[in-house]
């Protein structure tokens, strides 16, 4: 009852009516009734597959980390009883977010899975190319990036080597170093997407995990995110222009969680409609 005005209110009631035949009002007083109704039908009437089929879904793209084995995608692809395509989508946020506490340990896992010892930018790119080839073999053709904002702080490969070495040694990176690394890593990825004909999807405009007290209690992504307004039009335009200049701008999907960015995105996208 506290969600009126939010799309979640409409979506929730639409799904309850469409799949479970419930036409009432979901609130604290009816929560147990709705819970029991849905669970009874999930036991007897609905399965995950039947819900997918009833929704006329023909393709599902999951969000997958570069180190994922994709074992379930392989099993679904071999299952003749399910004709809905289920394909992986490439989500390398853990490689992008060099400032996060688990970056070094994650890079160790990426090294192991890719078979490449990652110690600098060149070896990181080699490992990423290996994993992208594996994803492509399993049907992937789209990426997904969750950024605070699209940035453009270019730097030399030597500079990025130093930033990676610094972070892998356990040191913190400065904000400028973080932005340089993310810029060059995203440019590298975008050029690879263009080369292998993947679409690049970028969404931004979210300030995550705002409530530290609740984060420590519940962990990340538990309902304490908000709209962010850090995005700058100039950096987005410069990022796309750097790729367009060398004719390496991939098919691109852009959207912000901040509706104030929509007109900016629309006008900037209009400047790059001649890319191959």
Residue ranges and their predicted role:
Residues 1-196, 248-266, 270-276:
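Metal-cofactor-binding active-site regions of metalloenzymes
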Residues 199-207:
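Histidine-centered catalytic micro-motifs
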Residues 211:
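Hard-cation-handling environments
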Residues 215-223:
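Short glycine/proline- and charge-enriched loop/turn segments
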Residues 225-237, 257-264:
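A general structural motif
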Residues 239-245:
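Short, basic/hydrophobic alpha-helical segments
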């Amino acid at each position: 009852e506290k969600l009126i005005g939010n799309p979640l209110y409409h979506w929730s009631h639409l799904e309850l009516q469409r799949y479970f035949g419930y036409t009432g009002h979901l609130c604290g007083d009816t929560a147990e009734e709705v819970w029991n109704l849905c669970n009874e039908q999930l036991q007897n009437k609905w399965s995950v597959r039947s819900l997918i089929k009833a929704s006329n879904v023909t393709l599902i793209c999951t969000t997958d980390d570069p180190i994922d084995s994709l074992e379930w995608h392989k099993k679904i692809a071999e299952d003749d009883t399910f004709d809905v395509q289920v394909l992986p989508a490439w989500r390398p946020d853990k490689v992008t977010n060099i400032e996060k506490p688990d970056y070094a340990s994650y890079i160790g896992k990426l090294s192991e899975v890719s078979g490449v010892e990652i110690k600098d930018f060149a070896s990181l790119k080699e490992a990423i190319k290996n994993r992208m080839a594996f994803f492509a073999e399993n049907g992937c053709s789209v990426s997904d990036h969750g950024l605070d904002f699209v940035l453009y702080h270019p730097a030399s490969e030597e500079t990025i080597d130093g930033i990676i070495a610094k972070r892998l040694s356990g040191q913190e990176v400065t904000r400028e170093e973080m932005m340089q690394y993310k810029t060059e890593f995203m440019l590298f990825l975008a050029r690879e997407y263009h080369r292998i004909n993947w679409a690049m999807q970028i969404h931004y405009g979210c300030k995550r995990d705002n409530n530290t007290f609740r984060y420590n209690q519940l962990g990340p992504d538990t309902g304490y995110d908000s709209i962010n307004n850090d995005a700058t039009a100039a950096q987005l335009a410069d990022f796309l222009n750097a790729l367009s200049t060398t004719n390496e701008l991939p098919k691109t999907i852009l959207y912000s969680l901040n509706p104030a960015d929509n007109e900016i995105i629309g006008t900037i996208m209009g400047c790059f409609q001649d890319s191959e």
